[in-house]
Amino acid sequence: MSYRAVLWDLDGTLTDSQEGILRCTQYALKACGIEESDPQKLIRFIGPPLAYSFATFYQMQEPMVSFAVEKYRERYGTVGWKENRLYPGITDCLKALKAAGYQIAMATAKPEFYAKKIVAFFELMPYFDVVIGSSMEHSDASKAYLMQRAMQQLHIPETQKEQVVMIGDRKFDAEGAAACGLPFIRVHYRYAPVGELESYPSVYLADTVLDLKTFLLAHAAS
């Protein structure tokens, strides 16, 4: 199979955002009266929507969930979004994919405002045709919905969606790809819990960005 478009997840796939997410999560939990120092519990916040994470991992209910999200964003909006780094080789990968003729989009659960800010901060905007994220008001938008929006803005018809591949690191990415009928590439850098993605089909497992680039260039549509 050959591909002509790629949809990227952001946290844990394009960037290593652990520092910012963990610090902002601790800040929000402390505001809710919870002291959390276990990094393994905090790492669970990398990938899923915030409201889902607070409700699922700390059994919060409204209005506490909304308060926690507000406190998280309070710190994230000032310093947290910059506590972030590109995975080695990402810029070269995007540059090579663009040169090979790929359309490149992002579909992330992160609010679109911050997703675009991060892409611009790392000087990656020239490589992206579309950056799609959730809205501040509806941060629990499904990954499938975000992927559909990205494909619509890339003007990819339903009859050609098999030529679009989703790249991600968590089950939310795999579930979204399956719901949209898209092939899925799993990146195995560090954050997904052991066994989380074993039951989801994927066309490739990339241990490094170089692996990912090599596979995509070998399967670029002519």
Feature locations, PLM:
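Active-site neighborhood of HAD-like aspartate-dependent phosphohydrolases
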Residues: M1-R44, Y58
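Substrate-recognition element of Asp-dependent hydrolases with the DxDx(T/V) motif
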Residues: T25, C93-V119
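Helix-loop "lid/cap" segments that line or gate small-molecule binding pockets
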Residues: A28-L29, P49-E62, I118, A150-Q153
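Substrate-recognition "cap/lid" segment bordering the active-site pocket of phosphatases
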Residues: F113-V165, K171, A178-A179, V194
